[in-house]
Amino acid sequence: MSYSAFVQARDFLQAHRTDYETAYREFKWPELNEFNWALDYFDVMAANNDRLALWVVNEDGSEQKMTYAQMSKRSNQVANWLRGLGVKRGDRILMMLGNEVPL
């Protein structure tokens, strides 16, 4: 499973972040045939996760908050929108977004 292999490697590095020699000597790169950040990491982490993921305080004092689950749902909506425009797996696209919560 890509998620668990990645998390295991990440956790090892975090546990040894102040011990460079051990981290360098014992770290093993996870064997990942394929890895998709959105599907293999973020979606797994976001599944039924109602913890706060993003909290933006605007200049006027208003706030925008989103949970991991909400961000995952919105990401899926954008992916489906792109699919509807004809974007296929493997296509390269560039999206320019402002510094704001809505995609």
Residues covered by each model-derived region:
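Conserved AMP-binding/adenylate-forming core of the ANL superfamily
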Residues: 50-101
